């Protein structure tokens, strides 16, 4: 559902009744897209809107927030047993901005535990089902954020993207999802997985709605030292672009058939060529070494003492610390902590972590060279259609599914997933990658492409 459609509904029946209807839909849903539904708070805000007390660009609009983004007084669990009882005492920067613009936070969206996964199957609260086929996953790690848009269980949503975690569910659910340039959106209040890679971003049913949400959440925040201090304003533009197909990024036959059809549509207006990125064959391995290394450091703070999951005290601090973490973290999180600790250990730091950072430099160099020739680069967002639940039981197979998305995070570039129709009743996404702070170009190009495929409907 788009903002324009929601406003028509509110105008005809009032915000309270419209929100009540959405809450009823969520309650009956089998998707498991929410961890926490903010029923009472949402209805109070809807009443304020009906009384004319709610103002702003998002006034009266229901927004879902991924459950690794801090919301004051509302459970923020990271889909983990470790934080299953954690209620933050502050709002994330992006949540502050939502509230300033009158948005209604309708709930906290389900996700992979600590954002570690591609299918939302690692969530302590259970898998998110795909609205197009409930036997399949909605993608990850922001699976709930994608599913709620596709199922009309929210009008807008926020996700976070460390290696494709917005773009993957956007592709699998047939909606729009943007991973902004690193630093455009403040990460203050985002519970960290891998600080140098992740970014908060918007998901929506149309480019106009996506752009509006980005306008709201982008901008200066001194509490995030990596924040670029730049605002964003969407400005329509209509120009012929130089579009590069990345040779090293592809997919299976079903995905490539639809991708090639999209390329032919793009050729009708834009100049299309092919570009090779030699470093990409090393990008996936480098990404996981860096991400897991940062995760092992970030997650060291969960000790069962100050907040979150705790146990009865034991006679030994070391035993207590180990037992809390063994019971509080799921298998995938423990696997990544272990591998990250190994990569950072004294004997292997140079062999793994430093080498991965050198690959990262090569990836950035390849992108820089490509953007000297092309305005945007394209690929399939995901190399396959949405997986069946349980299909990716092997961790390595799950990691390989991120092959098209992780280079963007290594370079800190913006990337958009655009729905380009269905194959066998399942959505396919086109990934559009831009140069630093070229979100306006991406969104305009994405709008043009999306309109030719029915805007994802």
From Swiss-Prot:
Its EC number is 6.3.5.7. Disulfide bonds: none annotated. The keyword DNA damage does not apply. GO terms for cellular component: glutamyl-tRNA(Gln) amidotransferase complex. Keywords: ATP-binding, Ligase, Nucleotide-binding, Protein biosynthesis. The active site is at 66 (charge relay system), 141 (charge relay system), 165 (acyl-ester intermediate). It catalyses: L-glutamyl-tRNA(Gln) + L-glutamine + ATP + H2O = L-glutaminyl-tRNA(Gln) + L-glutamate + ADP + phosphate + H(+). InterPro entries: Amidase (IPR000120), Amidase_CS (IPR020556), Amidase_dom (IPR023631), AS_sf (IPR036928), GatA (IPR004412). Pfam families: Amidase (PF01425). One of its GO terms (biological process) is translation. One of its GO terms (molecular function) is glutaminyl-tRNA synthase (glutamine-hydrolyzing) activity. HAMAP family: GatA (MF_00120). Allows the formation of correctly charged Gln-tRNA(Gln) through the transamidation of misacylated Glu-tRNA(Gln) in organisms which lack glutaminyl-tRNA synthetase. The reaction takes place in the presence of glutamine and ATP through an activated gamma-phospho-Glu-tRNA(Gln). Belongs to the amidase family. GatA subfamily. Heterotrimer of A, B and C subunits. This is Glutamyl-tRNA(Gln) amidotransferase subunit A.
